[in-house]
Amino acid sequence: MPPEVVRGREWHGRGVSLFAWTNEPDDSRQPPLLTEHDGRIIGLNGHLADPADVTRLPDDSAGGCFSAWIARDGELSASTAINRVCPVFHAETPDLHVAGSRALLVHLAARDDDRVEHDVLALQTMVRQGFFLSDETPYKGVSALRPSSRLLVRDGARTITETPLPQAAPMPTSARRKRAAIGELADALLATVEPLRDLGEPVNLALTGGRDTRVLAALLHAARVPFRVTTNGLDTHPDVIIARVIAARLGVEHTVIAPPQTAAKDAVLVEHPLSRAWETLRTCEGMTSAYETIVSYLPYSGKPTMSGQSGETLRAGSLNLLQTDLGDKALRRRIETTFGKDAKLFTAEANEHAQELARPWLARTDRLEALDHLYIWYKVGRWQASARAGSLRRGDPVRPFLDNRVVRAALSLDQSWRLSEEVIYTLILRLAPKLRDVPIEGKPWRFAANQAPALFRRRLPEHLPTARTAGGWSWRTSPGPALTDLLRDQVLGSLDALTPIVNPDEVRALFAAPVVAKPALAWHLYTVSTLLTGLYPGKQPEGLPRITVSRPDPAR
């Protein structure tokens, strides 16, 4: 972002300095950049549901999406919330302890020179998955603080304490107990949005026909928060059809943004992959693959927005949702493949490292809980924490599903119960009974399809199958020969940098065809290759041509 939009504050005490920067134009969004209370200087990364809670930090019961930094003479602490989506990175040298919200900054601040030293072995997980399945970072000596953890440096000595994620209670056996359990989750959700009542302008909710944004529409309705909804798509798309019904039932304004209607294209012009990689490395610091589309910079806006990001938390996490077989062997295999994907591509050392990272998760006897917590630790706490850096330059959207109290309440509910989707179905009806018979987009409710008797299923709303866009294709998943050539040239041209973690012959085989068969893996390799060969930090590439990517089958 332009340096002129960044402002900062700093505090210096005995043996401790605290620096804070933001692109928010002023402190109208409370709490301010730094808060002084009871002899402590408190900094906040993210937001609190109740800004007054800043004086209670660190506190596991605080609502919001945040990490906290507290300084006084001779003492510094940094703490994460339950999902660490606002991260804390830390490093230690013989003379210095450094903690910060940006990993590369921590790395450079801890060094005597300005040279970047990478942790190549740690990057094996970036190549496999496009994000980190560990507490490692791309930078030597820099680690991510775990969820619900506190780093404390007092008079030069560092300690780290960690609060385990909540253990889920057994599934309630009576309707009364189910209502009570879901009531606690509903109360936590309501607390996240109640402060939005007094903003003076409505919240803009991106509404689809699916589950997660419906929870949010019901939530805003129940909390009496003024809001309007926006849906992207054609009038015939299930998202638009269902969102229109929801908006009418709840009495809110609904705007449909139709995609541009252009003639079918047999090819598209796309950004040069080196430019894409540079922006991804700059924004996400080598912890997100350039395969992902990172939100570009726009001037900061304080307008309240909301989407269904991370709604899988209420449904036992995306890793469990991928499963059709919930047997022990199948769930164990999901953990193994999550950490050990594409094993043939990697060196023995890289595979051993992946197995070491998987070991504590495989040791858990409750597989559903393990996959549920894996989602929080890594899919939210590393992938989303990194990828959302782009959108945070534009503003700080309200994310109820990332709220510290909401996540804690959700994790306290039985995983199989959440996975059945009965929890969110009941939650929607509790918050907005008017939505009882509104169809759902995609597959039927899981508990209805798998468990409910036929008579009960007939009382549930119908589902509308996910629309298939005729002739739809993506240049990322069908990169074509020209883009494949560029990915191949970069990766094969820098194999020496990658050989500590990958087998060169397997990499060559991956790129042997004119069009790479595993484009996501190719992009992950490309991202790590450009990182290790010094693309960033460095000057932004200039004068690179756009690339023509042809549709695989123009006649289709």
Go through each PLM region and give its residues.
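Core structural elements
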Residues: 150, 372-387
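Short coil/turn segments at secondary-structure boundaries
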Residues: 136-143, 392, 422-425, 439-444, ...
